[in-house]
């Protein structure tokens, strides 16, 4: 301040060093695959895993006393309580398609699905136990969801093995800590087929995730047929070259500027396809939660209407 009280407009010196910008010629912005491969080779792979070191990990796995481990060649017998017929059918399919194991009426090894013994109380609705030994694999739970989780653990125990499969004599107790274990998929911006959605359901259910967050509406697209509001899909499910957006939305992301092309910019699920997806997911104990964006991120719906 000066004696008169006014500020003096004198700039203060500031030490500032400007570093030269690094361009594409000095930085490896896009590492080649061979460099990534070489880097991956440097990772330590010496850890000795146990048979029960699976993902997701189980709460408890201990050796079963008084029982012997056993081998599974190419066939198993599958028995089950009638309440678990759906889970038995899914297990039969996966044993065949993933591990090449045929389910027959008589075999040295039996897989049995049943309710928990009356003396045992489930921690929650997804609790299950697996007891293996002497040629028997017993999966028990208080609900069909628990049985399904147990079958996914069995499939994981067999992963990474060549025929002949071997199972140790084990006693496994497991349950999830969190009731909501979900995966969000944004198909508003990038559409995909129902077949791909079913594959996703298969994958997430194999890891015991139980929710598919179905993000089907956003600024860039509306992907679900609503009877009586056909314009939501006739306009909102298509992106392409347009000056007025009367027949389709602006390109945004992909679409090849062609609203009729089979790209991730175009497409929607019919009412019947969505119902089929819901049933498919429910069989695998996955809950589908549709999400309608509003009031923000609702441009596709607003333009369409």
Regions found by a protein language model. Give the residues of each.
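Acidic, contiguous N-terminal accessory segments
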Residues: 2-181
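Feature activates predominantly on carbohydrate-active enzymes
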Residues: 123, 127, 131-305
